[in-house]
């Protein structure tokens, strides 16, 4: 489904990604973790072409992301993306946020789009908030709306870039619960996160990054029980000590 081969990226003279290779199979959940500044968010943004890369190749459902002939907007319409800061339109209601891209990008009728939107709001526990504006919702609720908006496009895969890092601690679980349900329904997911409990619960594999490199790419149980690299051992000892 998602394949990265020898991907490298520079910001001018600074190399932020160094020869990164991994893949995510259909229906697989892969968590990408590592210390701040390790290249995690940059890597996931390269997957749908939000960030260009200079070497290597990335393909999603056999479509080459870096090929100049590739219609990136069309590809992005098939890949759901959930960001750290929600990125909802503040001047539109919750329902209008869900309807807009369905109508403009997919060409769906408004009635069908609203029906799909309401079904997804119910799925994330926010049906009664359809007529509200994002500013009237908590951070956790806004992030759940963002997930519903991404799902409204019927994506073949979902990318999450630290979806809980901007939330108050007590709101994190309501977002993770939605993501766990998505994973158990078979959604292909690539998730950048520090939520190791989520990783243990639903990830099939964990990719650990440090200084722009993929240091480990291992089945979840193996990563947590017997990390191969010293760097991953240090990271886990710090993040799991409490």
Residue ranges and their predicted role:
Residues 1-4, 8-220:
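ABC family nucleotide-binding domain
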């Amino acid at each position: 489904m998602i394949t990265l081969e020898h991907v490298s990226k520079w910001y001018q003279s600074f190399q932020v990604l160094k020869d990164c290779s991994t893949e995510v199979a259909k229906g697989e959940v892969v968590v990408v973790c590592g210390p701040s500044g390790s290249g995690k968010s940059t890597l996931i943004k390269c997957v749908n072409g939000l960030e260009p890369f200079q070497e290597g190749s990335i393909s999603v459902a056999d479509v080459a992301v870096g090929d100049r002939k590739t219609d990136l907007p069309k590809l992005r319409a098939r890949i759901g993306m959930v960001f750290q800061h929600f990125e909802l339109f503040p001047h539109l209601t919750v329902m209008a946020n869900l309807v807009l891209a369905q109508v403009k990008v997919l060409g769906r009728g408004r009635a069908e789009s609203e029906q799909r939107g309401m079904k997804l709001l119910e799925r994330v526990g926010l049906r009664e908030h359809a007529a509200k504006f994002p500013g009237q919702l908590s951070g956790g609720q806004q992030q759940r709306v963002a997930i519903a908006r991404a799902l409204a496009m019927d994506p073949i895969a979902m990318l999450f870039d630290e979806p809980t890092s901007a939330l108050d601690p007590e709101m994190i679980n309501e977002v993770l619960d939605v993501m766990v349900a998505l994973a158990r329904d078979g959604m292909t997911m690539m998730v950048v996160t520090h939520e190791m409990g989520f990783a243990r619960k639903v990830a099939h594999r964990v990719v650990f990054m440090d200084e722009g490199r993929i240091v480990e790419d291992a089945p979840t149980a193996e990563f947590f029980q017997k990390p191969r690299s010293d760097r991953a051992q240090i990271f886990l000892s710090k993040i799991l000590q409490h």
